[in-house]
């Protein structure tokens, strides 16, 4: 299987963790905060992580089960939050404009927002530009602590699965 260099080159910290697993981990963090327990396993070959299974347990008792793979994306293009009153599903975590609520097999509601931009990074760029124009040194939307916390979670996952970024260490 041939991948883009940003994904397949260990010198660029390529692999699933920093390319796709970061999105559901960030989403779980933004919903429930920093987890009290992080458990993970992964598949590593030639210095590249091809996928991870991560379980984050939060103080409120909720658990996020995350699976991500750069080899087999079938079925992984969505994020699902399940609870006692049903489940919420959204297409890929980063640029979705639609959320589906399923109470049971008979009840389904679809909520649509404005269409995703062609490149959802434009939203992030616009937010940063606004912060700079306003003289803010930190984003209200994604404070430095949130970025640091997510990176710490990713680092814990990396260590648990035995992934090394030799060029960065």
Q: Residue spans of the language-model regions?
A:
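Active-site beta-strand termini and strand-to-loop segments that position acidic
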Residues: 54-61, 81-83
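C-terminal helix-rich "cap/oligomerization" subdomain common to oxidoreductases
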Residues: 59, 127-169
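Active-site loop of classical SDR/Rossmann-like NAD(P)-dependent oxidoreductases
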Residues: 112-126, 142
